[in-house]
Amino acid sequence: MQFPDRLIQHFDSALRVMSGVSVAGRPNPAAKVADGDLDSAQRRHSAGLMRVNHVGEVCAQALYQAQAQFARSPAIRQQLLLAGREEEDHLAWTAERLRELGSRPSLLNPLWYAGAFALGTVAATLGDARSLGFVVETERQVEAHLNQHLSSLPPQDAKSLAIVKQMSTDEAEHGAAAHALGAQTVPPLAQMGMQAMAKVMTSTAYYL
């Protein structure tokens, strides 16, 4: 696919993400799970966590699109696009769960998307190995915060738990795939910067 075609594909993806019309390619893992009895505080907490997870998937779409756009290797570009497609499943699942909880996505999604796309572009310009290293570190941090959510979500919120469990499994697989393609380890200082930015995003998106 030529660069102009990839650019058009990116704009199409961005519009779908921003408009909330993403469609999952796989069944929702919570589709056949009974909804638990949540009180108002538990419902608000679950919604806050799932909003954070939805923002994470908005950022994932931007990151993978940017990195795929500027990847040098066709094989690496295809892997990034494949991972991005699976992340779009997560986007659809978390959006659906937010609706079920009577809540909404983050009001700052355009800002999160733009920032993540810029970050992905910078990572891609450093070369494929470093870009893949960025994927590995991103997925490691995302998997860690998803596992924290598994402990923080109300035990009776079986639907959210089912979604987060599948997301965690997928993130680990994406990180392993990037590592197998020759990822270069992200320097410790960059890892700390990524963690700091993620903390700002998660603490803000929980409410907004």
From Swiss-Prot:
Lineage top rank: taxon: Bacteria
An annotated GO cellular component: plasma membrane
Residues that hold Fe cation 1 according to the record: 57, 87, 90, 171
Annotated Gene3D superfamilies: 1.20.1260.10
Cofactor note: Binds 2 iron ions per subunit.
Annotated localization: Cell membrane
Biological process according to GO: ubiquinone biosynthetic process
Membrane topology of the entry: Peripheral membrane protein
Reaction catalysed by this enzyme: a 5-methoxy-2-methyl-3-(all-trans-polyprenyl)benzene-1,4-diol + AH2 + O2 = a 3-demethylubiquinol + A + H2O
UniProtKB keywords: Cell membrane, Iron, Membrane, Metal-binding, Monooxygenase, Oxidoreductase, Ubiquinone biosynthesis
Presence of the UniProt keyword Ribosomal protein in the record: no
The enzyme's E.C. designation: 1.14.99.60
Cofactor: Fe cation
Signal peptide: none
Biological role stated in the UniProt entry: Catalyzes the hydroxylation of 2-nonaprenyl-3-methyl-6-methoxy-1,4-benzoquinol during ubiquinone biosynthesis.
Similarity comment: Belongs to the COQ7 family.
Protein name: 3-demethoxyubiquinol 3-hydroxylase
Encoding gene per record: coq7
